[in-house]
């Protein structure tokens, strides 16, 4: 299954707000159901609940079905909680790190910057959005000056208290912002509200 490129509002109306996909907020279809309609709503099966959790994770981080399945398999082979390791793997992707630092408004925007070779990790160009960031990595923008100026204004308007503790944003040089990875993210700092165990259960027969 390929990466979704259709209308984003359609997705968040169905799956509720996904910060990585879009910064627009809408009321989900579930909340719009009138009192008379509630009595005729179909009861959601356990499979349906797990499927929705999986879809929320996939669309928020902009993954294909195959990519997410591969991450689940990696998480299953690692020591510790499979669900938490899965979230950690997704959160430490370069495209998500750029988003959490406030460099860009969404993960798709981050992916575009990376694909255009505008992002450096430890002074080396990285053009792979799925690049796994590690503690002590330093992330900078190598874009043209005009583009850098736009990005620096975006970062200045981004509230620093929104940046999770495992990351640090340095604005000592306003036109050359730097992001630092302090350590691997913990569960409390995950930006998406989700029950990761439902995703693990969904893939229990596939991974």
Curated annotation (Swiss-Prot):
Top-rank taxon, per record: Eukaryota
The S4 RNA-binding domain is annotated at 92-155
**InterPro entries cross-referenced by the UniProt entry:** Ribosomal_uS4 (IPR022801), Ribosomal_uS4_bac-type (IPR005709), Ribosomal_uS4_CS (IPR018079), Ribosomal_uS4_N (IPR001912), S4_RNA-bd (IPR002942), S4_RNA-bd_sf (IPR036986)
One GO BP on record is:
ribosomal small subunit biogenesis
Q: Which residues form the signal peptide?
A: none
Q: What keywords sit in the KW lines? A: Chloroplast, Plastid, Ribonucleoprotein, Ribosomal protein, RNA-binding, rRNA-binding
Q: Where in the cell is it found?
A: Plastid, Chloroplast
PROSITE patterns, A to Z: RIBOSOMAL_S4, S4
- The principal localisation class reads plastid
> GO cellular component annotations, sorted alphabetically?
chloroplast; small ribosomal subunit
Which molecular function terms from Gene Ontology are attached?
A: rRNA binding; structural constituent of ribosome
Q: What does this protein do?
A: One of the primary rRNA binding proteins, it binds directly to 16S rRNA where it nucleates assembly of the body of the 30S subunit.
How is the subunit organization of this protein annotated in UniProt? Part of the 30S ribosomal subunit. Contacts protein S5. The interaction surface between S4 and S5 is involved in control of translational fidelity.
Q: Which family does it belong to?
A: Belongs to the universal ribosomal protein uS4 family.
* UniProt protein name: Small ribosomal subunit protein uS4c
């Amino acid at each position: 299954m390929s990466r979704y490129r259709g209308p984003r509002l359609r997705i968040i109306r169905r799956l509720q707000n996904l910060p990585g996909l879009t910064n627009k907020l809408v009321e989900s279809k579930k909340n719009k159901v009138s009192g008379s309609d509630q009595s005729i709503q179909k009861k959601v099966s356990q499979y349906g609940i797990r499927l929705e959790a999986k879809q929320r994770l996939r669309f928020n981080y902009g993954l294909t079905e195959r990519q997410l399945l591969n991450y689940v398999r990696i998480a299953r082979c690692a020591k510790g909680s499979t669900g938490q390791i899965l979230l950690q793997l997704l959160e430490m992707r370069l495209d998500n790190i750029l988003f959490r630092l406030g460099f860009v408004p969404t993960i798709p925007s981050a992916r575009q910057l990376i694909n255009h070779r505008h992002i450096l990790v430890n002074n080396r160009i990285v053009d792979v959005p799925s690049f796994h960031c590690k503690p002590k990595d330093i992330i900078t923008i190598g874009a043209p000056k005009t583009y850098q100026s736009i990005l620096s204004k975006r970062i200045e308007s981004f509230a620093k208290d929104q940046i999770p503790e495992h990351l640090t944003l340095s604005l000592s040089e306003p036109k050359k912002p730097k992001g630092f990875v302090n350590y691997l993210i913990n569960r409390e700092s995950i930006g998406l509200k989700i029950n990761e165990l439902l995703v693990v259960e969904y893939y229990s027969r596939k991974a």
